[in-house]
């Protein structure tokens, strides 16, 4: 199973860390996208197997599960930009 997490703020980062520490989805099968590179770098430093990107479409492509961890007012534009 491959998981994409859109957003690496407090919520998205916590979800990514929890999944990466778990055994259900290998960390290498988790991709996190965020517009701020610093948050992605921090996650990658903690869990080197995590995949990170600034491109939401890249993160969502091929994912079996997409977790949206963005502010409510950003949800619609983020979903619209994805070609699902």
Model-derived segments and spans:
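Rossmann-fold NAD(P) dinucleotide-binding segment
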Residues: 51-84
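NAD(P)+-binding Rossmann beta1-loop-alpha1 motif at the extreme N-terminus of oxidoreductases
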Residues: 1-47, 51-54, 58-61
